[in-house]
Amino acid sequence: MAKLLCSYLFICMFVLSGFLVFSSAKQLKTCTSVIKLGHPCDIESCLNECFRVYNTGFATCRGDKYSQLCTCEYNC
């Protein structure tokens, strides 16, 4: 009976510690910025400009090919 109780307590401690680590993990914030290019927006030049300006490891771009405005999303 004592072995069963110790095993149960060990499993509960393991699950609780995993939950605490998961809940306290820092989440990445995503920021959005508008980049004005001198030519119609294309994804490649938007990504290059976003990486150059914000120096981040993650970036996505949106925009249309008729507008000179591109929307850049990056990790803050």
UniProtKB/Swiss-Prot annotation:
Family that this chain belongs to: Belongs to the DEFL family.
Keywords, sorted A to Z: Antimicrobial, Disulfide bond, Fungicide, Plant defense, Secreted, Signal
Keyword Disulfide bond recorded: yes
Keyword Secreted among record annotations: yes
UniProt protein name: Defensin-like protein 164
Region forming the signal peptide: 1-25
Pfam entry (one): SLR1-BP
InterPro entries (UniProt xref): DEFL (IPR010851)
Disulfide feature: 31-76, 41-61, 46-70, 50-72
GO cellular component, as recorded: extracellular region
PANTHER family: DEFENSIN-LIKE PROTEIN 163-RELATED (PTHR33830:SF11), DEFENSIN-LIKE PROTEIN 184-RELATED (PTHR33830)
Encoding gene (name): LCR38
Highest taxon of the lineage: Eukaryota
